């Protein structure tokens, strides 16, 4: 029987976020990345979404390690939740380890977790796998791709990347090593598809610094900059521009404060001397000497920028003349919330500069020409497009064919697909359990499809509670039912409807004989629920959640 290497995406396909891929060879497994996704607008009460790791739980004795490409939430956000079910060592670069450690501390997992830091250019032996760390450029420091070596051959897993010839930290992507791997022979390439729809090259991060200088030099008022907290190089450029323009910088927002602490302690950010001040002290400076760096680039409701916009931030109040710079583009799905914050900032008299107006943000993902370079350098026998929605995966497949690949050597899978590679062929050989697990407060996985459906229904049509006072002995209805509504109608203006609902509920209850009413609450509740629901839809064309409550007296 021919040897097989299995590639099993558990997240990140046909979606943006919750990236996770398992590699299986010789009866052993390694996992690459462990990310979360933001909940959709219809996921009421959900904090985040993580991959379903049922397959990994069933096979946890075969797992040899979790390897992390970089420290973005869509690659590390699920780690604490998964570690509570699967104890496995984590291998990552130093900066990524610093961010993961914050999560482990928050979940009291530091002592029970083996966290190993690995430098780019080094390799780790994990059972029958040898995983080589290769430096790449991305919108967060210390990002890597992996060359996953097995006796069958080498898989190059790019993670998120771009080709930046002028990176802020001076560390360019290791194209030389990728080229060497191509010469040695790459069995399969698994590559980022996020920006495959965009032609050309992604601009260098350094271009944003020039924009900051121009915006700072042409402003005599306070400047507030919001960006992704994880983009250390972006924040570094804000600090540098502020220092050159004689301004002080204060930081607000929990994730931004944590990121500043980790990046400065580990040496990934260098704060110009006498530039950083406490957020409580900066308001004592002249407006033209102030810069505030904040979270909230995605319009998150509890973020610092959101609270500034809606006048609930304790230290910062937006006023006329303030210049607010949004140095980030909205993640797909967040456009409405970002727009709401921008509108409120304008309403308060601020000047808002955002991506459409200037070169204030550049992507951290490779565009078409960069992807072609990676394909040309690695010369893979097989190809699996990762990290993207269906159209992105399909376009990446077309790009690979333009580079000369045989369509039969390309696999476009779904989350849970088992992509099997032998030395000569590739196929999707079945699937494993995969999907979404909802995190709601401290609950993980206890909110399923039925609960989400009920929450959606409550949010859209409200709730009607019908309280039925029933005599315990003979089942007689002791009084007219009490009707309680929430989120359905304004009761004071709907007296006729409320009276009619009482009659409908009484008629339904009367349809159940007294003897049955005295013994069977279930049948009574079912009859009342059906009658009230039908009446409401017929007369209002709405379907609130109807909850009959039987009270025995």
Predicted regions and their residues:
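A glycine- and charged-residue-rich anion-binding loop/surface
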Residues: 13, 37-45, 62-63, 354-357, ...
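Short Gly/Ser/Thr- and Asp/Glu-enriched loop/turn motifs at secondary-structure junctions
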Residues: 119, 414, 542-546
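Hard-cation-handling environments
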Residues: 197-327, 331-356, 360-500, 504-516, ...
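C-terminal tails and terminal domains of large nucleic-acid-associated
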Residues: 517-553
């Amino acid at each position: 029987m021919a040897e097989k290497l299995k590639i099993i995406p558990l997240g990140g396909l046909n979606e943006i976020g919750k990236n996770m891929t398992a590699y299986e060879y010789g009866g052993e497994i390694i996992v690459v990345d462990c990310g979360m996704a933001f909940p959709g607008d219809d996921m009421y009460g959900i904090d985040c979404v993580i991959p379903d790791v049922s397959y990994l739980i069933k096979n946890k004795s075969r797992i040899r390690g979790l390897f992390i490409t970089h420290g973005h939430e869509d690659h590390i956000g699920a780690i604490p939740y998964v570690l509570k079910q699967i104890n496995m060592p984590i291998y990552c670069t130093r900066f990524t380890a610093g961010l993961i450690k914050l999560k482990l501390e928050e979940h009291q997992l530091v002592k029970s977790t083996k966290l190993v830091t690995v430098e780019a250019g080094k390799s780790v032996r994990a059972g029958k796998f040898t995983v080589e760390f290769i430096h790449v450029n991305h919108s967060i420091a210390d990002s890597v791709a992996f060359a996953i070596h097995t006796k069958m051959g080498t898989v190059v897993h790019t993670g998120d990347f771009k080709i930046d010839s002028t990176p802020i930290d001076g560390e360019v992507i290791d194209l030389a090593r990728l080229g060497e791997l191509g010469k040695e022979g790459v069995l399969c390439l698994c590559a980022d598809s996020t920006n495959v729809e965009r032609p050309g090259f992604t601009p260098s991060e350094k271009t944003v610094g020039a924009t900051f200088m121009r915006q700072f030099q042409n402003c005599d008022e306070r400047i507030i900059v919001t960006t992704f907290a994880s983009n250390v190089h972006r924040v570094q450029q804000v600090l540098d521009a502020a220092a050159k323009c004689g301004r002080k910088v204060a930081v607000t927002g929990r994730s931004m404060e944590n990121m500043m602490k980790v990046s400065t302690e580990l040496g990934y950010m260098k704060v110009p001397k006498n530039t950083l001040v406490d957020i409580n002290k900066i308001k004592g400076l002249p407006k033209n000497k102030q810069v505030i760096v904040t979270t909230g680039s995605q319009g998150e409701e509890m973020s610092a920028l959101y609270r500034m916009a809606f006048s609930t931030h304790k230290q910062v109040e937006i006023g006329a003349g303030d210049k607010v710079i949004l140095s980030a583009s909205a993640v797909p799905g967040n456009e409405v919330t970002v727009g709401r914050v921008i509108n409120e900032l304008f309403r308060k008299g601020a000047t808002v500069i955002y991506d459409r107006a200037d070169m204030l943000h550049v992507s951290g993902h490779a565009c078409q020409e960069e992807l072609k370079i990676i394909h040309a350098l690695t010369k893979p026998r097989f190809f699996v497009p990762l990290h993207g929605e269906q159209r992105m995966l399909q376009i990446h497949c077309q790009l690979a064919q333009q580079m000369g690949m045989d369509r039969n050597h390309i696999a476009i899978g779904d989350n849970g697909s088992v992509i099997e590679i032998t030395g000569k062929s590739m196929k999707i050989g079945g699937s494993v359990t995969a999907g979404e697990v909802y995190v709601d407060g401290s609950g993980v996985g206890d909110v399923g499809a039925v609960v989400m459906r009920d929450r959606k229904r409550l949010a859209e049509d409200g709730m009607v509670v019908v309280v039925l006072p029933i005599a315990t002995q003979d089942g007689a209805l002791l009084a007219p039912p009490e009707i309680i509504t929430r989120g359905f109608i304004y009761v004071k203006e709907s007296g006729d409807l409320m009276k009619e609902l009482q009659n409908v509920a009484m008629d339904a209850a009367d349809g159940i004989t007294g003897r049955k009413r005295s013994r069977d609450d279930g049948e009574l509740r079912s009859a009342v629920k059906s009658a009230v629901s039908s009446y409401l839809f017929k007369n209002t064309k709405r379907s609130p959640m109807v909850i009959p409550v039987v009270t025995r007296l």
